[in-house]
Amino acid sequence: MLFRSGAGALLKDVSEAAAQSSLTGLEFACGIPGSIGGAIFMNAGAYDGEMKNVADTVRTVDREGNIHTYSRDELDLGYRHSRFQDNGEAIVEVELCLEPGDSKAIRAKMDDFTQRRESKQPLEMPSAGSTFKRPKGYFAGTLIQETGLKGLQVGGAQVSTKHAGFVVNATGNATAADVRGLIHEVQQRVYEKHGVMLHPEVRIIGDA
């Protein structure tokens, strides 16, 4: 069944709307921050689910105002990647292919994912979600923790003491420069200790 949404809708709201319609496939997205357009742009995923599994059609507008429509096979969705990171087009509408399911089972799965997130992730503090991509053969949070960087702070930005894979706004007034500086410091120290270069999962646009 096709489920259509404007790209600006919050991903968690789309996940909730799908659940209320007894449609399964988007439960993994219930706690991922950002819009559904952003989720397609980054091929967001969690708990063995990703947008690649449910995306059916994406409509975009280019710099000249032309509308383009892409089918599932044309999206080039990979680990935190889509074709839209390369072609400069803005996503305006998304159609997802979801399956009819049992509403109680869908809700139970979403509740389980929410509880797991709340127990392990610093959801009580502002952040942009998971900060670094998962390097092949490793987990970014584990490498950062083993380097002893939990609690490391640059200005108002801090490596979360709850989950080292998150950079949080610990003081409430962290700047983009603070976050960028902390990301750079973490990259350097992890590389020096483990020989692994971490790459940001967040997109950095412009100068901080």
PLM regions and their residue ranges:
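General beta-strand structural signal in soluble alpha/beta enzymes
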Residues: S5-A7, G25-C30, T69-Y70
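Short glycine-rich loop/turn motifs that provide flexible caps or phosphate-binding loops at active sites
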Residues: A7, C30-G37, A44, A128, ...
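A gly/ser-rich beta-alpha-beta helix-loop segment of oxidoreductase catalytic cores
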Residues: A18-D56, S127
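Phosphate/pyrophosphate- and phosphate-bearing ligand-binding catalytic cores of soluble enzymes
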Residues: V61-G181, E185-R189, K193-A208
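Short, small-residue-biased leader/transition segments that mark boundaries at the very start
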Residues: M1-L2
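A short, flexible low-complexity segment enriched in Lys/Arg and Gly/Pro that occurs
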Residues: S5-L23
